[in-house]
Amino acid sequence: MKIQKPSFEIWLQQPGLDGIYRQIERAGRVCYKSEDHCTADSARPFVERMVKSDHTAMLEHGTVYLACPSAGRPAGAAGPAAALPPAERYRRNKFSWVNDVAGTAYVTTNLRVLAENGWMADLDLLAGP
């Protein structure tokens, strides 16, 4: 038996949607031992395949920051919470954090929350941290 010394690395996520996809791809490729398959344009298709095959665990590694009105119309989501404004949907989600400032709800969540709830359209609300 070979004993491995435990270790970890902190990977800072790059900004924007591309940064989310690249962060998830990096974690997923380590999980699948396929780091050598990363290319400049492989992140998004890799993540889309994970979503399509319902392998959503790795999506938790992609932090998503959204900015939306504290109250208002839904952003085209599907599912049981679709009738709720985006901010309220995330307030009711235990894997999301919402901070209201001057009528704007700043949401911190992860891509798994969006994918599993049919809220991928909310990526139009993407904001910086």
Predicted regions span which residues?
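A conserved ligand/cofactor-binding region detector
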Residues: 1-129
